[in-house]
């Protein structure tokens, strides 16, 4: 079954993951004033497919996209999103490093495309351009955004996966997006269990019924905590 736009609560939808192309779950929060996406996806093609699904459900395009962490499959669609992007300042720091590497190394894009079969599939062997950009707004502290009838809380967390984890909590719907925060460090997948324990404590204290991660499924909160 291909990617689908699933409604999981009154205001929240999830555009489901696609493992062969390493496309993560993308979130969508529909407010009466504006809507927000969670993560920008793997490429402009990923964004286009997501937006097509929104339009098929008569949902407006997001005015804001929050980024859960810097990895390419969550950020390399940023240049193609509608409206503005928002991320932790650590996320922009990592993306700035990628842009510097691209400028210094003419072979960077070729190396990236050949680093994994899922990346080659997503970028159609180079027919789609790789275009990293920085987020429009950097967060140095947590923030709540009133979308109209629903709130998006942008929360910081320790994570064994990256040092820039951003959680997105929708308190009215008791939904929490965590990106890849519970995974080990890429590419070794080494697990820092102290950070994992701190992440679990952070998730436990948030009032949520459903937790949406990056590449798996939609968890009941207790189900995820038992895995951690």
Where in the sequence are the language-model features?
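Conserved beta-strand hairpin/beta-sheet module of binuclear metal-dependent hydrolase folds
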Residues: 5-52, 166-181
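Metallo-beta-lactamase
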Residues: 7-8, 35-36, 40-44, 96-225
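Active-site metal-binding motif and surrounding structural segment of the metallo-beta-lactamase
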Residues: 45-91, 204-210
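Divalent metal-coordination and catalytic microenvironments
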Residues: 11, 29, 39, 54, ...
């Amino acid at each position: 079954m291909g990617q689908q736009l699933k409604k999981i609560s009154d205001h929240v939808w999830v555009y489901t993951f696609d493992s062969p192309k390493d496309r993560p779950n993308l979130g969508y929060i529909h407010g009466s004033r504006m809507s927000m996406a969670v993560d920008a996806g793997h490429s402009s093609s990923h964004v286009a497919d997501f937006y097509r699904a929104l339009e098929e459900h008569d949902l407006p395009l997001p005015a804001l996209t929050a980024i859960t962490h810097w990895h390419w499959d969550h950020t390399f669609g940023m240049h193609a999103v509608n409206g503005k992007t928002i991320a932790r300042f650590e996320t922009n720091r990592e993306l700035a490093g990628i842009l510097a590497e691209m400028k210094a190394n003419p072979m960077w894009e070729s190396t990236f495309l050949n680093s994994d079969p899922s990346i080659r599939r997503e970028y159609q062997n180079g027919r789609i351009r790789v275009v990293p950009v920085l987020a429009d707004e950097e967060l140095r502290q947590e923030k709540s955004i009133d979308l109209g009838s629903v709130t998006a809380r942008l929360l910081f967390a320790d994570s064994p996966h990256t040092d820039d984890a951003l959680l997105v909590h929708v308190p009215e719907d008791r939904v929490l997006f965590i990106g890849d925060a519970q995974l080990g460090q890429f590419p070794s997948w080494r697990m820092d269990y102290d950070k994992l324990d701190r992440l679990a404590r952070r998730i436990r204290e948030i009032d949520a019924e459903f937790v949406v991660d990056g590449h798996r499924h939609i968890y009941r909160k207790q189900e995820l905590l038992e895995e951690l």
